């Protein structure tokens, strides 16, 4: 992959006026390959699928922003922030996939080698023919152009020095997007016979254009009133208008045998629009948000409690094929919140928060229509969908002893959703496709907890760091077996408990640093309806790192770690990877200039793998990546932006904000940049 970027920033300020802005250009050219396997849970025997894909993605992006802050007097503050962006992408992709009625790994070691149609059309040469349901080979070309702009104006006026103030915030945004997609696909159905008794074949050559336009504006007024000592009552009202329009048109190019992805659109293609595969949708949203909150500020604690009321009026004009409708919807959402901070000392605090949020299903999900633009994933609307409500609670505690250089941090999070929207899927065993209908379901929740401990030993040269975490997910979904009147829908529950631990020990002096580290992550995955799907995969790693500082301002750093996976059904996932990185840097010109040479994954062993588990199935994907590479840096520090405040304005106040817990406390894992 190739990446090229350039940035231009400026910042200046006077006593009353601050100006800043930036312009950025970015170009990316990436070649992405992936192989994957998916297991869909079914009451009467699971469905299995494998896929290979290759993509070439090119993207050009330009963004410019400006910031002006004016303080005409000590009581008034005015901020204006406009932004503009332009983007262009070109993507070429090719994919091969296949669906099977039993586990293909029971017959061959690598089913992904048996997905190309040219290789498997001869039954005598196909070891998976007895379990094969479909095979799909496709290619697509996408080009997209987008232009967007937005601006925010904020005026704040202090009415006295007791905390009474009023704030106005206005915003406008506009986006125009033009997307064109060209596709070729060939699907063979091995369980569905044609009129001649052979395998059914579906060939689709299409050109799809989808221009979209969006704009919005909003105005918000906030008033804060001190009602007692260090006690404030705040009122806020916001009105927002949003407009969205999309017009999808699909042209059938099957009647043009000379057309391909590498050729121009044929003459006369405009006469072959398929009305049933097109869609026009125009949304108009009129949103109101009125909130009230009460805030107490005391020496030892801060408490904020409030409620937001959100009446919404929506209008939809919709057309798909012969189906046309103009419909409106009026809903009422509400969102309570609570935030408590208890300060035990300057370096020790406990924070507890609660957030509640109600949300509505999309208007298109409520329409009683059938969307068969993708024959492998047919979608049906559900007018009976109810709104969902999500509860989220967080607890956070941290403390630090500067004398002993000892820190403790803990965090607990719990989230649950009532009437969450789940996809009820009906499987077609003849085609390997799905018919999906959104439905409300209860039982989705998750809990997460972590504990971190960092301390120096008495001589301060040795440090120990421990990070422990636990995550539990309870996912529910509807699984359907049978067809028509014989269809039976059942509720499935999958649970995933993941326990992790990372331990680091380090020695440091003025010129030398050496550390040892180890980590383990263990998962217990259970499926209620089909216990045979249960797995207990785990990963572990161990390694060392060192850094040597030379008297002539040269630094040598290196780290090495052995990372391992175990417990996966696919034996190719159970592997060891020895990862070695190194860096050499030299500082000169009185510390203002640094040149460094970095080498990542020197042994070329690292892989990129992602996994997901839901109540309806699990999937594993492996991606190619430029993990083994070198980088040469030259950094020269200039102080031409004046004060630190001016530099912060130039950077848009970006950053992590606040002190960190300490080096090396995060959990270990696979993939991602490996810092020195």
What do the PLM-derived regions correspond to, one by one?
Residues 1, 6-676:
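Primarily recognizes Gram-negative and organellar outer-membrane beta-barrels
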């Amino acid at each position: 992959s190739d990446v090229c970027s350039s940035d231009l920033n400026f910042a200046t300020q006077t006593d009353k006026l601050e100006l800043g802005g930036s312009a950025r250009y970015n170009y990316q050219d990436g070649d992405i390959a992936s192989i994957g396997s998916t297991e869909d849970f079914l009451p009467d025997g699971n469905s299995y699928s494998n896929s290979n894909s290759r993509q070439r993605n090119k993207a050009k992006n330009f963004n410019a922003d400006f910031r002006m802050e004016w303080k005409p007097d000590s009581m008034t503050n005015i901020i204006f922030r406009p932004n503009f962006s332009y983007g262009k992408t070109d993507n070429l992709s090719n994919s091969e996939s296949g669906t099977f009625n039993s586990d293909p790994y029971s017959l061959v070691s690598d089913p992904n080698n048996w997905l190309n149609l040219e290789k498997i059309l001869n039954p005598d040469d196909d070891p998976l023919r007895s379990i094969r349901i479909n095979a799909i080979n496709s290619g697509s070309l996408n080009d997209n152009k987008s232009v967007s702009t937005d601006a925010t104006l904020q005026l704040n006026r202090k009415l006295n020095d007791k905390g009474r103030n009023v704030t106005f915030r206005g915003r406008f945004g506009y986006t125009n997007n033009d997307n064109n997609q060209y596709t070729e696909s060939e699907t063979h159905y091995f369980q569905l016979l044609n009129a001649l008794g052979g395998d059914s074949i579906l060939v689709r050559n299409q050109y799809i254009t989808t221009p979209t336009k969006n704009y919005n504006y909003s105005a918000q007024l906030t008033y804060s009133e001190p009602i007692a000592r260090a006690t404030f009552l705040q009122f806020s009202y916001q009105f927002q208008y949003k407009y969205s329009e999309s017009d999808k048109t699909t042209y059938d190019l099957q009647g043009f045998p000379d057309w391909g992805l590498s050729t121009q659109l044929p003459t006369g293609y405009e006469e072959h629009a398929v009305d049933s595969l097109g869609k026009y949708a125009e949304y108009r949203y009129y949103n109101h948000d009125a909130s009230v909150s009460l805030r107490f500020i005391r020496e030892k604690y801060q408490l904020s409690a409030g409620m937001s009321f959100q009446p919404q009026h929506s209008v939809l004009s919709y057309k798909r094929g012969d189906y046309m409708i103009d419909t409106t919807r009026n809903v009422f959402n509400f969102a309570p919140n609570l935030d408590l901070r208890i300060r035990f000392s300057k370096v020790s605090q406990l924070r507890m928060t609660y957030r509640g949020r109600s949300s509505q299903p999309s208007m298109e999900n409520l329409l009683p229509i059938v969307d068969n633009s993708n024959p492998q994933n047919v979608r049906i609307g559900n007018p009976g969908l109810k709104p969902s409500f999500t509860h989220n609670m967080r607890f956070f505690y941290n403390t630090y002893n500067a004398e002993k250089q000892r820190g403790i941090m803990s965090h607990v999070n719990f989230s649950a959703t009532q009437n969450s929207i789940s996809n009820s899927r009906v499987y077609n065993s003849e085609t390997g496709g799905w018919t999906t209908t959104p439905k409300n379901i209860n039982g989705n929740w998750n809990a997460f907890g972590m504990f971190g401990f960092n301390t120096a030993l008495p001589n301060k040269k040795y440090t120990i760091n421990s990070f422990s975490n636990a995550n539990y997910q309870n996912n529910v979904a509807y699984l359907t077996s049978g067809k028509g009147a014989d269809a039976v829908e059942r509720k499935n529950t999958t649970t995933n408990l993941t326990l992790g631990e990372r331990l680091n020990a380090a020695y440091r002096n003025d010129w030398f640093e050496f550390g040892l580290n180890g980590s383990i992550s263990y998962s217990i995955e259970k499926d209620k309806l089909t216990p045979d799907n249960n797995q207990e995969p785990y990963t572990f790693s161990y390694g060392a790192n060192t850094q040597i500082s030379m008297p002539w301002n040269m630094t040598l750093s290196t780290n090495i770690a052995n990372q391992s996976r175990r417990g996966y059904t696919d034996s190719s996932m159970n592997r060891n990877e020895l990862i070695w990185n190194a860096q050499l840097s030299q500082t000169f010109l009185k510390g203002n200039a640094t040149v460094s040479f970095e080498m990542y994954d020197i042994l070329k062993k690292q892989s990129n793998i992602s996994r997901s588990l839901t109540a309806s199935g699990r999937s594993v994907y492996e991606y190619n990546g430029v993990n083994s590479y070198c980088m040469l840096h030259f950094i020269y520090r200039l102080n031409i932006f004046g004060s630190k405040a001016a530099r912060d304005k130039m950077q848009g106040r970006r950053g992590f904000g606040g002190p960190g817990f300490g080096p090396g406390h995060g959990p270990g894992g696979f993939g991602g940049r490996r810092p020195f």
